[in-house]
Amino acid sequence: MRCVVQRVREASVTIGGERFSSIGAGLLVLAGISREDTEADLAWMSRKLPNLRIFEDDEGRMNRSVKEIGGELLVVSQFTLYADASRGNRPGFTESAPSEVAQPLFDRFVELLRRESGLPVETGSFGADMQVSLINDGPVTIILESPKK
Protein backbone atom coordinates (compact mmCIF):
# COMPACT_ATOMS: atom_id res chain seq x y z
CA MET A 1 0.00 0.00 0.00
CA ARG A 2 1.29 3.41 -0.93
CA CYS A 3 0.05 6.73 0.45
CA VAL A 4 0.93 10.31 -0.33
CA VAL A 5 0.26 12.22 2.88
CA GLN A 6 -0.12 15.99 2.92
CA ARG A 7 -0.44 18.16 5.99
CA VAL A 8 -3.28 20.54 5.20
CA ARG A 9 -5.10 23.48 6.66
CA GLU A 10 -8.18 22.33 4.76
CA ALA A 11 -9.07 19.99 1.91
CA SER A 12 -12.15 19.02 -0.05
CA VAL A 13 -13.44 16.73 -2.79
CA THR A 14 -15.85 17.96 -5.44
CA ILE A 15 -17.72 15.60 -7.77
CA GLY A 16 -19.85 16.86 -10.64
CA GLY A 17 -19.63 20.43 -9.37
CA GLU A 18 -20.95 19.50 -5.91
CA ARG A 19 -18.87 19.39 -2.76
CA PHE A 20 -18.73 15.74 -1.69
CA SER A 21 -16.55 15.93 1.43
CA SER A 22 -14.26 18.31 3.27
CA ILE A 23 -12.01 18.64 6.30
CA GLY A 24 -10.31 21.36 8.28
CA ALA A 25 -6.76 21.02 9.59
CA GLY A 26 -5.35 17.53 9.29
CA LEU A 27 -4.15 15.08 6.66
CA LEU A 28 -5.08 14.60 3.04
CA VAL A 29 -4.20 10.99 2.19
CA LEU A 30 -4.02 9.80 -1.41
CA ALA A 31 -4.17 6.01 -1.04
CA GLY A 32 -3.04 3.47 -3.62
CA ILE A 33 -3.76 -0.25 -3.32
CA SER A 34 -1.42 -2.68 -5.11
CA ARG A 35 -2.18 -6.16 -6.42
CA GLU A 36 -0.22 -7.66 -3.52
CA ASP A 37 -1.78 -5.74 -0.63
CA THR A 38 -3.41 -7.63 2.20
CA GLU A 39 -5.19 -6.86 5.47
CA ALA A 40 -1.74 -6.57 7.08
CA ASP A 41 -0.83 -3.65 4.79
CA LEU A 42 -4.08 -1.89 5.61
CA ALA A 43 -3.56 -2.42 9.34
CA TRP A 44 0.03 -1.13 9.20
CA MET A 45 -1.00 2.04 7.35
CA SER A 46 -4.04 2.64 9.58
CA ARG A 47 -1.75 2.53 12.64
CA LYS A 48 1.00 4.67 11.06
CA LEU A 49 -1.06 7.58 9.74
CA PRO A 50 -2.78 8.80 12.94
CA ASN A 51 0.52 8.68 14.83
CA LEU A 52 2.78 10.24 12.19
CA ARG A 53 4.36 13.24 13.91
CA ILE A 54 4.34 15.90 11.20
CA PHE A 55 2.57 18.74 13.01
CA GLU A 56 4.55 21.38 14.84
CA ASP A 57 4.81 21.56 18.61
CA ASP A 58 5.15 24.78 20.61
CA GLU A 59 8.83 24.98 19.65
CA GLY A 60 8.13 24.70 15.93
CA ARG A 61 9.42 21.11 15.60
CA MET A 62 7.47 18.37 13.86
CA ASN A 63 6.58 16.52 17.00
CA ARG A 64 2.79 16.14 17.08
CA SER A 65 0.43 13.77 15.31
CA VAL A 66 -2.97 14.41 13.76
CA LYS A 67 -4.42 12.63 16.81
CA GLU A 68 -2.60 15.00 19.16
CA ILE A 69 -3.89 18.11 17.39
CA GLY A 70 -7.44 16.72 17.11
CA GLY A 71 -7.31 17.02 13.33
CA GLU A 72 -9.26 15.33 10.57
CA LEU A 73 -8.40 13.02 7.68
CA LEU A 74 -9.57 13.04 4.07
CA VAL A 75 -8.73 9.79 2.29
CA VAL A 76 -8.93 9.60 -1.50
CA SER A 77 -8.38 6.41 -3.48
CA GLN A 78 -5.75 6.88 -6.20
CA PHE A 79 -4.76 3.90 -8.33
CA THR A 80 -2.28 6.06 -10.28
CA LEU A 81 0.14 5.90 -7.34
CA TYR A 82 1.23 2.54 -8.76
CA ALA A 83 1.83 3.89 -12.28
CA ASP A 84 4.90 2.61 -14.12
CA ALA A 85 6.28 5.09 -16.64
CA SER A 86 9.73 3.52 -16.94
CA ARG A 87 9.16 2.50 -20.58
CA GLY A 88 7.58 4.76 -23.15
CA ASN A 89 5.57 7.84 -22.35
CA ARG A 90 2.25 6.32 -21.38
CA PRO A 91 2.12 4.97 -17.83
CA GLY A 92 0.98 1.43 -17.17
CA PHE A 93 -1.05 0.43 -14.13
CA THR A 94 -0.44 -3.31 -13.88
CA GLU A 95 0.82 -2.94 -10.29
CA SER A 96 -2.46 -1.33 -9.16
CA ALA A 97 -5.11 -3.65 -7.80
CA PRO A 98 -8.12 -3.96 -10.12
CA SER A 99 -11.12 -2.00 -8.89
CA GLU A 100 -13.09 -5.09 -7.84
CA VAL A 101 -10.20 -5.95 -5.49
CA ALA A 102 -9.17 -2.42 -4.54
CA GLN A 103 -12.58 -1.06 -3.54
CA PRO A 104 -13.27 -3.51 -0.68
CA LEU A 105 -9.67 -3.09 0.52
CA PHE A 106 -10.01 0.70 0.40
CA ASP A 107 -13.30 0.55 2.32
CA ARG A 108 -11.68 -1.72 4.92
CA PHE A 109 -8.71 0.65 5.21
CA VAL A 110 -11.04 3.58 5.94
CA GLU A 111 -12.87 1.49 8.54
CA LEU A 112 -9.58 0.57 10.25
CA LEU A 113 -8.37 4.18 10.11
CA ARG A 114 -11.55 5.44 11.76
CA ARG A 115 -11.22 2.86 14.51
CA GLU A 116 -7.48 3.38 15.03
CA SER A 117 -7.54 7.18 14.99
CA GLY A 118 -10.83 7.98 16.68
CA LEU A 119 -10.88 11.06 14.44
CA PRO A 120 -13.26 12.23 11.72
CA VAL A 121 -12.30 10.47 8.47
CA GLU A 122 -13.88 11.70 5.25
CA THR A 123 -13.40 10.10 1.83
CA GLY A 124 -13.72 10.73 -1.85
CA SER A 125 -15.90 8.45 -3.97
CA PHE A 126 -14.08 5.36 -5.17
CA GLY A 127 -13.62 5.39 -8.94
CA ALA A 128 -15.28 8.77 -9.45
CA ASP A 129 -13.82 11.68 -11.39
CA MET A 130 -12.96 13.97 -8.48
CA GLN A 131 -11.52 17.42 -8.06
CA VAL A 132 -9.41 17.56 -4.91
CA SER A 133 -8.64 20.98 -3.44
CA LEU A 134 -6.30 21.66 -0.58
CA ILE A 135 -4.33 24.26 1.25
CA ASN A 136 -1.05 22.51 1.96
CA ASP A 137 0.44 23.51 5.31
CA GLY A 138 4.20 23.88 5.19
CA PRO A 139 4.19 22.39 2.64
CA VAL A 140 4.66 18.96 4.18
CA THR A 141 4.23 15.97 1.85
CA ILE A 142 5.37 12.46 2.77
CA ILE A 143 5.21 9.20 0.84
CA LEU A 144 4.51 6.12 2.95
CA GLU A 145 4.67 2.54 1.78
CA SER A 146 3.70 -0.52 3.76
CA PRO A 147 6.64 -2.85 4.44
CA LYS A 148 7.53 -5.33 1.72
CA LYS A 149 6.57 -8.93 2.40
UniProtKB/Swiss-Prot annotation:
UniProt similarity note: Belongs to the DTD family.
Protein's name in the database: D-aminoacyl-tRNA deacylase
E.C. no: 3.1.1.96
GO MF terms, alphabetically ordered: D-tyrosyl-tRNA(Tyr) deacylase activity; Gly-tRNA(Ala) deacylase activity; Ser(Gly)-tRNA(Ala) hydrolase activity; tRNA binding
Protein role: An aminoacyl-tRNA editing enzyme that deacylates mischarged D-aminoacyl-tRNAs. Also deacylates mischarged glycyl-tRNA(Ala), protecting cells against glycine mischarging by AlaRS. Acts via tRNA-based rather than protein-based catalysis; rejects L-amino acids rather than detecting D-amino acids in the active site. By recycling D-aminoacyl-tRNA to D-amino acids and free tRNA molecules, this enzyme counteracts the toxicity associated with the formation of D-aminoacyl-tRNA entities in vivo and helps enforce protein L-homochirality.
Complex formation: Homodimer.
Location in the cell: Cytoplasm
Claim: Plastid is one of the keywords in the record: no
Entry note about domains: A Gly-cisPro motif from one monomer fits into the active site of the other monomer to allow specific chiral rejection of L-amino acids.
Organism listed in the record: Chlorobaculum parvum (strain DSM 263 / NCIMB 8327)
